[in-house]
Amino acid sequence: MIPFICVERYIYDDTTPRILFDYHAAFQSATSYFFESGHENVLFLVEKTDSLAKQEKIAGYEKALLCANRTLSSSCIAEISLYQSYDLISLNIQKSISRYLPTAIITGGNRLTMLLLKALRELGKDCPRDISIIGFDDMLWCELTAPPLSCIHRDIRQMAELASQALFDRINHLPASPLARYADIHLVLRDSTRIIDNGPLGEQAVSPDSISLSTEEKALLKKGHYQVAVSFHYTGTAWAALHQKGIRDELEQYGIDIISTMDAHFDPALQNMQLESIKMQHPDAVIAIPSDDVETGPAFQELSRMTRLVFLSNVPQNFNRNDYVSCISVNERENGTNTGRMIGEYLKDKAHAKVGFIIHGAMFYGTTERDNYAEKILRESYPNIEITARKGFIQIENAYKVCLEMVTEHPDIQALYISWDRPALLAIKALKTLNRTDIAVFTTDLDFEIAQEMNQGFVKGLSTQRPYDQGKAVALAVAKSLVSDNVPKYIGVQPYVVHEKQLKRAWKDIFFEALPEELGG
């Protein structure tokens, strides 16, 4: 009898050797990733066939449902026939999206992935803002799309090698290998997926696009001669300046005046005094970033009884939903996940890598979420990486000493996570003092000085907020609150990932100007 083996298929109840991919585990992993990222409706698009591979993919999807304590009746599976025109296939995908209203979609084939992109374009849907995607088969073009696609990656080369080995074993009558052998298949995460954030009080985040003003509301705003006060924790950064510009540009459209802008210099006591001054100005609304969630809470509570409060980044402790209008923030879960994933990808080829975490450590909701999710993605997705040290700096000026002590105590650290750019600059200064510029730095927020360090190779990657967009979003929420009670409680803005070689483009996207000459522009 001529020796033969089955590749990616097998004869049911037969003893013929087969080389397979574990589709059940792969699609369970992809579906679970979306559930863990806050998605409720995850649509699975699969080709309409009778193959065992399709059944395994569906079984993996359904297992993820059960593991997430969901019933099979909540499944969103659409079987799509590929034996029709591309336009008809796209139309059927669009119908499935309209039926299930997913925030995330997984495809079971590479042609389905391409046709899904076509369908989303025709629907005017943005990926990942409106719908996140995990495609199938990590083709070369998957990194070239906008955004680059997350995919279930199959190691075809390994499958061919296993198949060749199994076939030669049979030809040479060697001892039988296992009946089924599996080639590697795993999830590759890029920029086509997003994490759905929750607000400080558990509210699901909505996009700034969910707020709109009618013609009548705009007219009411211009007639109202409204006044707004701004209380910032600190204004001495480009981040704060861009927030202020976004706020000013948006409010000016509706004739709303900014009567004061306060800078607390990260001092809760000073901010409390400034809030007393704001009270005497009797503004129609206040935009604020608390410098400390606990210490400023009572002062903000008192202010909430006389005016509308719209917060940036975080809400003071002991506030309930009736105490403020809305909170606008970068999606901090995604911000941290992006940074953690960059560390993971940087070190993924190391057999065993060690990382240090220099976290904020203060009572600040946004940075706590960010730091925790950076750690979470490393622990769950990169088993070769060990977090050997984790310490909070509390006050920015402490970051230098914390880094100095951490690297001295753990000299085998290969990369550092630092909560945001200003403490990261002090940590880099400590690394230079120790002559340890071999340690890669990853952080959040883009500014001139951190861009300089990225240009010089110290910072390998960062995830940044979109401060101008966030400023416009908070101003729009304020404007809406002056003429309507229909304002979302939590508005999340998607962060922006910056790799070393993408600094020029990122600078233009974030700051709306060309990269300065000093940075290579």
PLM regions and their residue ranges:
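Intrinsically disordered, low-complexity acidic/proline-/asparagine-rich linker or regulatory tail/stalk regions
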Residues: I196-H225, D509-G521
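Extracytoplasmic "Venus flytrap"
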Residues: Q227-G246, I259-A269, S277, Q281, ...
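Solvent-exposed loop/turn segments at secondary-structure junctions
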Residues: T235-T237, F266, D292-V294, V315-F319, ...
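Hydrophobic alpha-helical segments within soluble ligand-binding/sensing domains
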Residues: P17-F44, A59, S85-Q94, T113, ...
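Flexible loop/turn connectors
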Residues: Q94-L201, L434-Q502
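Flexible loop/hinge segments that line or gate small-molecule binding clefts
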Residues: M1-A26, R111, D137-L149, D293-E334, ...
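An alpha-beta-alpha
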Residues: A30-N69, L179-S192, V228, F232, ...
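Hydrophobic alpha-helical
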Residues: L43-V46, A53-L140, S164-Q165, L187, ...
